[in-house]
Amino acid sequence: MNQTAILICCLVFLTLSGIQGIPLSRTVRCTCISISNQPVNPRSLEKLEIIPPSQFCPHVEIIATMKKKGEKRCLNPESKAIKNLLKAVSEKKSKRPP
């Protein structure tokens, strides 16, 4: 009887070790529902997040957090004004001393 219990426990552990997590939601969900083409003043930015495409969202998302009120705006990565903003921010970071 003891050997049977050990064998059953081993089979259960081997079976459970092969189970992998499956996401509950299979829908595509992006953080940004709507995007803005309006230019943003770099001085009014608190934080700028760039979220690359993933399995959950096929688009590049750029989220700007503003200094006043902590408002978050989704920016259009294809907009010329936003491309200029990204360039200005990256140049500012590269000039910053380590």
UniProtKB/Swiss-Prot annotation:
Q: What is an example of a GO molecular function annotated in this UniProt entry?
A: CXCR3 chemokine receptor binding
Report one GO cellular component: extracellular space
Report disulfide bridges, numbered on this chain: 30-57, 32-74
Keywords, comma-separated and alphabetical: Chemotaxis, Citrullination, Cytokine, Disulfide bond, Inflammatory response, Secreted, Signal
**Which GO annotations describe the biological process of this protein?**
adenylate cyclase-activating G protein-coupled receptor signaling pathway; chemotaxis; G protein-coupled receptor signaling pathway; immune response; inflammatory response; positive regulation of release of sequestered calcium ion into cytosol; regulation of cell population proliferation
- Write down the superkingdom of origin: Eukaryota
Under Gene3D superfamilies, the record lists: 2.40.50.40
> Major location, coarse class?
secreted
- Pfam families assigned: IL8
Q: Where's it found, cell-wise?
A: Secreted
Function per UniProt: Chemotactic for monocytes and T-lymphocytes. Binds to CXCR3.
Family label: Belongs to the intercrine alpha (chemokine CxC) family.
Report what the protein is called.
Answer: C-X-C motif chemokine 10
Identify the species of origin: Macaca nemestrina (Pig-tailed macaque)
Taxonomy of origin reads:
Eukaryota, Metazoa, Chordata, Craniata, Vertebrata
